[in-house]
Amino acid sequence: MRLRKFKKDEQAIELPINIVVMLVVGMVALAALLAIIPKSKENLSVDIIDVKVSDDPTIKGNTAKVVGAADHAVTVNIKVYDKNNNPVEKASATLTGGGGFGTDQTNKTGLAHLYLGGSSGSMVTIRPNQQSVELKLVVKANGFYDYEDERAVLLIQTRD
């Protein structure tokens, strides 16, 4: 008797259909959220090619000697790569320190020329009793973690 009554009872028929509909809508919403999430960021690699201080010759690497205490114009050439050693285009590079600053954007080959001094930035000041100045390099690009090196370039003061 109860089995027949249970078979004819249609009051709870909507419950499984509602659950199926909610499950489908939830899956569609989850798929949409996963499609919106951007791919993970990558690390940048930065090479400092050379450093030039005022009228002195260009020095390969990240260390240069400075003669005497004064304001100096500094030019630094860098190259920016991704994790596969491909050049990164349109990365913003900033070099600061010693009261000077310089900015540039990388070109198609990943090169940037940072000039501290003159019209595009202020000069680096080295005081009489100061032995060295460290310049901070920050590189930012879309889709990459920011690269930051507090001691990217070292300028060492010499007497002559």
Residue ranges and their predicted role:
Residues 1-11:
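N-terminal leader/signal peptides at the extreme start of proteins
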Residues 61-85:
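Beta-strand-rich structural segments
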Residues 122-145:
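Short, aromatic- and glycine-rich surface loops/edge beta-strands on solvent-exposed regions
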